[in-house]
Amino acid sequence: MFDTTLLILLGLAALGFISHNTTVAISILVLIIVRVTPLNTFFPWIEKQGLTVGIIILTIGVMAPIASGTLPPSTLIHSFMNWKSLLAIAVGVFVSWLGGRGVSLMGTQPHLVAGLLVGTVLGVALFRGVPVGPLIAAGIISLFIGKS
């Protein structure tokens, strides 16, 4: 039987390879493997917990320089004494807030997820973005449609 979903995933993986974005390509190939093997029984868990696991892994990656000591405490302290660093802190707070609104919106408005995913994959593949886009994009959408 013809599997349209598999064809779409293969197309998106190809787009990831063509654009030299291995993050997208590998992610989609992993999902294809899960789809075509008995691992597909894990999709409900992946759909429910995947975003949380991804955020945890992303946070570990961001916090690793602090934990390893390559970002010394003095640098952290100085970040409160420079206007550019203070601006970076403010932007970080704002974007985190947007991401939080985005997670809520994606949970309550699942029909928006498809558009967010397509937009994110295109942004990652064509414009060298990173796949944190759906959360922030959903947060921005929540500002326009008034949902939190």
Swiss-Prot record:
Q: Where in the cell is it found?
A: Cell membrane
The answer, when asked if Nucleotide-binding is one of the entry's keywords, is: no
The record, for Pfam families, names: DUF441
Q: Which domain of life is it from?
A: Bacteria
Kindly list the residue ranges recorded as spanning the membrane: 14-34, 51-71, 86-106, 121-141
Q: Which UniProt keywords apply?
A: Cell membrane, Membrane, Transmembrane, Transmembrane helix
Q: Name one GO cellular component term.
A: plasma membrane
What topology in the membrane does the UniProt record assign?
Multi-pass membrane protein
Q: Which InterPro entries match?
A: UPF0756_TM
Per the similarity annotation, which family is this? Belongs to the UPF0756 family.
Q: What is this protein called?
A: UPF0756 membrane protein KPK_3307
- Organism taxonomic ancestry: Bacteria, Pseudomonadati, Pseudomonadota, Gammaproteobacteria, Enterobacterales
